[in-house]
């Protein structure tokens, strides 16, 4: 059975920078999502890490660590708060395209993610360079969706 706290503790021994952040994130086990994700709870204004324990089953410890780093980086880089793109109404909004852009930005720095994670240079992002900002990837995704409607429909 997967115990998130064990793997968070291992991560913090290697990466103490994330200790304060980890204590501020509510961790919620759920089967309502297939993987893991962070969000802001609008009622409490706190970060929440939602995770499906089945997603972590069968991963190596290195993969589990990189998935946790991936989620923590979303908080550190303000991907779910201040840097959200502005929609047509002038409101900041989380979109699938922004989520993919932020995943590309983070994942280009992580080498032990499980198969299936979006990465620059792989699959539909084969022509995307590594180590760009989320905003860079977002602009590229928008342009690719404009140039190729089928690409945009996948978002």
State what each model feature region is.
Residues 1-66, 72-155:
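Short, functionally important secondary-structure microenvironments
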């Amino acid at each position: 059975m997967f115990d998130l706290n064990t793997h968070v503790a291992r991560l913090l021994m290697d990466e103490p920078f994330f200790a304060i952040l980890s204590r501020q994130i509510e961790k919620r086990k759920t089967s309502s999502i297939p993987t893991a994700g962070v969000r802001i709870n609008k009622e409490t204004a706190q970060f929440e890490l939602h995770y499906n324990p089945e997603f972590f089953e069968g991963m190596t410890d290195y993969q589990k660590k990189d998935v946790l780093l991936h989620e923590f980086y979303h908080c550190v880089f303000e991907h779910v708060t201040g840097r959200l793109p502005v929609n047509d109404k002038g409101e900041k909004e989380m979109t699938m395209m922004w989520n993919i852009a932020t995943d590309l930005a983070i994942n280009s720095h992580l080498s032990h993610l499980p198969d299936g994670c979006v990465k620059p240079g792989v699959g539909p992002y084969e022509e995307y360079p590594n180590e760009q900002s989320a905003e860079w990837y977002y602009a590229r995704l928008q342009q690719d969706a404009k140039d190729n409607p089928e690409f945009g429909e996948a978002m």
